[in-house]
């Protein structure tokens, strides 16, 4: 009989010696409060052609020194980040404050801000790389796949109080992977073609050698051993080169959720941030209560990722280690109901309630396809519609 907590690996520990792991201990900063922070990636698009514009260097230079605005791998991208916040609503207002001036500079240069998982028709071969050693090294190693990374996403950090909680929470969060991807899926197009997927970004990003689903380690020491092995064998030089869809950020004391496609508007972003915040805090509190968190076998987790990427809100997902299945939107309703008390305690009840609006109005990939159909397949109209959704 399967234990009530779900699937458990007999041992997932890396092969490194205990002495090696001790010498390479990773300190976790710890967050005394369950804080939240957001990283929001934007593409720059030409106001006339609606194609991508490689002008991020000039835009960031005009913005000036600002810890809330960062460069990224490609020169068509700027990243806007929040500070350390107490709630989803606070994070959204923080982002709004930064976006206003940044958007005015972008407009003055004849461009628009655009955020989706992929651009509907841009070609990766015309995009320019940001001048930085770490990006050059990434492309040198990954070659064709690295140059294909014409993708944008949303990353959410949630503070965790102890390193001992991190890996159990990450493993349990994988049960909600398809919910988050289906809700945020916004990348049906690739190079002007409809891929048939709700999130082609999810399929693309996992091609990088250290990206994709995390290993389901049970303890922090197992994660330390994994990082030791990765460094010793030359796979990574720094821990931030582990690009998992959910990963620890030890220096910040957070778990970073990197599942979601790019999000076009602040209301949906606030809803998704609230959902992720509530999920992590709920699991954290269940650990405090002595509960063993439920997990699923990695083959179920992998299948759920694919189903959500392919079918979006129409995905029938695997729920547990017993292989029970359910439509993702039906299960989402129960998840939202269960998280309502958590949301009230985190002052994000309104934002969490807004999650239910996404299936009602259609996720971004569905809205994009509707616009394309209404405009005889003109993908510039899709870009227009998405730009209009960014109401600051």
UniProtKB/Swiss-Prot annotation:
List the GO molecular function terms: ATP binding; glutamate-cysteine ligase activity
Q: Which SUPFAM superfamilies match?
A: Glutamine synthetase/guanido kinase (SSF55931)
Q: Which domain of life is it from?
A: Bacteria
Query: Where along the chain is composition biased (Low complexity)?
Result: 9-19
Using the chain's own numbering, where are the disulfide bonds?
A: none
Query: Quick check: keyword Ligase in the entry?
Result: yes
Going by the UniProt record, its keywords in alphabetical order are: ATP-binding, Ligase, Nucleotide-binding
Per the UniProt record, which EC number(s) apply here? Answer: 6.3.2.2
Q: Name one GO biological process term.
A: modified amino acid biosynthetic process
* HAMAP family given in the database record: Glu_cys_ligase_2
- Entry protein name: Putative glutamate--cysteine ligase 2
Q: Which organism is it from?
A: Mycobacterium ulcerans (strain Agy99)
Q: What is the lineage of its organism?
A: Bacteria, Bacillati, Actinomycetota, Actinomycetes, Mycobacteriales
